[in-house]
């Protein structure tokens, strides 16, 4: 006969390989704090409803706190044969308080228990990620404020397009991260319903108070359908989706840092704290932190894809497949946390190379649009015609191997006689960025105002 907690109808225990494939204690042990919080709320509710006697409630509560203390001290023994964190905690609780521990699982199943634990863990993690994203935004806004006047090339197709400022570029990521925070908060709002009390799938015949349990655990309300409560992993999927989009944003910036720190670009310098050397090439300073952020983005996206594939074919309600929700979710959200910390450190330490950036901003005929705009404003030329004329001027400069600002007035007038000496004022990169005063544009005054507004909105660093 099996001596498992669920083993009453079994004549023997599981095969060793069954025990190995079935056990989740190796990874779900990190749910211990959430599991104990859920059990404390559950047993308090059972006591308040008269389902358990007060002496059993007191014994169970004291026992759970003892188990929690053992885990915090590193003394708790996690045994594979107990399968998961729920059984591990209950087994130790039984050793501490005796038969009363068996009453804890009244009106509860591991199905609603694990759904509650996972929601609590994801909620806690989303709150921590939100604070980390805000810190990275703060670092970017501070850098934007400092480099509102630092001119650099703006790119499309990774080719010089128009001059912008380094501060403007940083603020672009502040905006992306703001949307990421919105997605994390939306996911948190939707997950903040409590499944506890749904039992295996159909609810329970005991007179429980699910609203009280939900309130005790900080949820807005209990989930409304017991089947959905135990079958749902949308909260994990949505959180992984938000994490994946955030990781994509970090990866894009990391890619830029990898390119910009190369000898071929030389746009920025990363500090020694976020670079490594080579075992054979003594001159190397490799942007490993940025490269690892870029790589971990793929890992995070993979976790989302993996869980989507796990869930896509499952009938209601719970299936053991859903045990596979944990490792990917844990790994992805903690990987994102690591990436956010690394990016914030890199941003605070990086040094833009202003001279190189300015020189690059003027290459590739990046002020050609300024010439076209000048033709529209000063000669009342339709933009399409101005575009054509500017293209011819660029071709003339390219044939001579010089920049637009170095092309003679005579050469320009041979293409468009109406061009005057005044045109050269708009061909410099500083004048180009200064002229972009439209809302959201790269003009330094705009950048300073937006950076300050973001810093005020984000507030000081939380200690």
From Swiss-Prot:
Gene3D superfamilies recorded = Fumarase/aspartase (C-terminal domain) (1.10.40.30), Fumarase/aspartase (Central domain) (1.20.200.10), Fumarase/aspartase (N-terminal domain) (1.10.275.10)
Reaction(s) catalysed by this chain, per the record, are: 2-(N(omega)-L-arginino)succinate = fumarate + L-arginine
Q: What is its EC number?
A: 4.3.2.1
The pathway it acts in is: Amino-acid biosynthesis; L-arginine biosynthesis; L-arginine from L-ornithine and carbamoyl phosphate: step 3/3
Organism's domain of life? Bacteria
By its UniProt entry, which HAMAP family does this protein fall under? Arg_succ_lyase
Q: What's this protein's name?
A: Argininosuccinate lyase
Native source organism of the sequence: Methylorubrum populi (strain ATCC BAA-705 / NCIMB 13946 / BJ001) (Methylobacterium populi)
In the UniProt record, what gene is named as encoding this protein?
argH
